[in-house]
Amino acid sequence: MRIAFLLTCHPPTRPSPIFPEVVRLLRERGTHVDLVYPDERPTDLRELRVEHDLYVLKSGSETSLSLAGALHALGAAILNPYPATAMCRDKIVASRMLDEAGVPAPPSYVVSHPQQLSPLLEEGPLVVKPYRGSQGRGVRIVDRVSELVEDGDDGGGPLLAQRYRQPEGRDRKIYRIGDDVFGVERVWPARTYQEKLGRPFTVSRELREIASRCGSALGLSLFGFDVVISEGRPYVVDISSFPGFKGVPNAAAHLADYIERAAERVTRGEQLLEAPRT
């Protein structure tokens, strides 16, 4: 089997310890693995061909997403599927899809300019974030109208605002790898690598059901989402189509197993995503 990972080149200060291990495990099992860094070199679109059984879209860059879209148009099998990833990367689209699926979330609003949020602040604070983005970049809590200023971190596009929910305890992250669901709780802000790893917690039946709804709504099998528990109720406040899975026990082995099974299904002419277990 031939698998290609579409990746971002991490600086030495931000290593990605899990995915080198995933690649090592796959290669040890006899899989041919290529690492592709779309942001690091030109790609001649005239020469672009589907040369792998499976492409794994790990990178969060716009270049990688567009390249995955071009490969998708040529018939490539991509994990997560390109249409699902594209929806998830747009927080406005993802928020509406999750709401339609009954996923609990704070009330959300879309605006073109920060000042348009002024009337909403009369009812309490808002969490304002760029409609595209990851790793908390550009996200801020706004309490007063004076804080609604133009910010270069917004990326120049529309903004998504969510009603702020006061969290109880630590931040919680839910990860899903196929049908397996994992929970990790962390302090915020996490300053050290150990704090970023957090500690596992047992995922409740309610959170498992929410994870199932998220995956079904967006067509994702590898993803993570942030949960805020406020006044005893869970609220999904963000979702990522292919997170780092930090703090998940044996994450590399779980990922390698799932990616290998996906590639095997493709080579047999079966559907890319596994049917959910019942």
Predicted feature residues:
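Rossmann-like NAD(P)H-binding beta-loop-alpha module
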Residues: 106-126
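A long amphipathic alpha-helix within ATP-dependent nucleotide-binding catalytic cores
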Residues: 191-236, 240, 248-277
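Conserved N-proximal alpha/beta basic substrate-recognition cap immediately N-terminal to
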Residues: 9-107
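Extreme N-terminal starter segment of soluble prokaryotic enzymes
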Residues: 1-6
